[in-house]
Amino acid sequence: MSIISAEAQKVREALIAKGIETPTVQLTKDKDSRRAEIQQHMRSVLELLGLDLQDDSLEETPHRLAKMYVDEIFSGLDYATFPKITNIENRMKVSEMVLVDDITLTSTCEHHFVTIDGKVAVAYYPKKWVIGLSKINRVVQFFAQRPQVQERFTEQILTAFQTILETDDVAVFVKATHFCVKCRGVKDTNSYTVTSAFGGVFLEDRETRKEFLGLINK
């Protein structure tokens, strides 16, 4: 069984309570078993598409896909991989906004399993705790590494940091290109989607929200 940290469990419970956790079922098989079964099923899919899996270029593709799904692009479905975070007491009494902008977002649309590519900004006003800046990037990446819809992803990031930092004063802004729009269907290569989520002072005070949006739009 995977070991889930207390911090990860708190975040998961907060998402469930708000109804914004990614729809999942309880896993009963270990990673090796899941890789093996996914590999078998992907082999069938590729054969049904008419691909020759005896070809040197394709023979390892089912294995590569299984490994990629379990260990890489969907690893965020397993809370055992949640970033290790140590809350640091705010002894310096930092009271100004802490903002991390232009965080790389690479996720997967859960409707068509193609790429979501964009940027994320996260800001908070410290109270009792602060965290290492790189941890903000890592938490964003954790939630990106699962099948996603952008609206839920944005809310998950907000709730995760509110839970970790024990403050409502968090803001999240996401701007992304969806390849389910870009490479299929309407095939619009220029459009992007913007979502945001605000808590605490960012939600209640217009000037604070304006300051945040002004900083990330420079």
Curated annotation (Swiss-Prot):
Keywords: GTP-binding, Hydrolase, Metal-binding, Nucleotide-binding, One-carbon metabolism, Zinc. The keyword Cell inner membrane does not apply. It comes from the Bacteria. Toroid-shaped homodecamer, composed of two pentamers of five dimers. PANTHER family: GTP CYCLOHYDROLASE 1, GTP CYCLOHYDROLASE I. Belongs to the GTP cyclohydrolase I family. Pfam families: GTP_cyclohydroI. This is GTP cyclohydrolase 1. The keyword Transmembrane does not apply. One of its GO terms (biological process) is tetrahydrobiopterin biosynthetic process. Zn(2+) binds at residues 109, 112, 180. Its EC number is 3.5.4.16. It comes from Actinobacillus pleuropneumoniae serotype 5b (strain L20). One of its GO terms (cellular component) is cytoplasm. GO terms for molecular function: GTP binding; GTP cyclohydrolase I activity; zinc ion binding. It catalyses: GTP + H2O = 7,8-dihydroneopterin 3'-triphosphate + formate + H(+). Pathway: Cofactor biosynthesis; 7,8-dihydroneopterin triphosphate biosynthesis; 7,8-dihydroneopterin triphosphate from GTP: step 1/1.
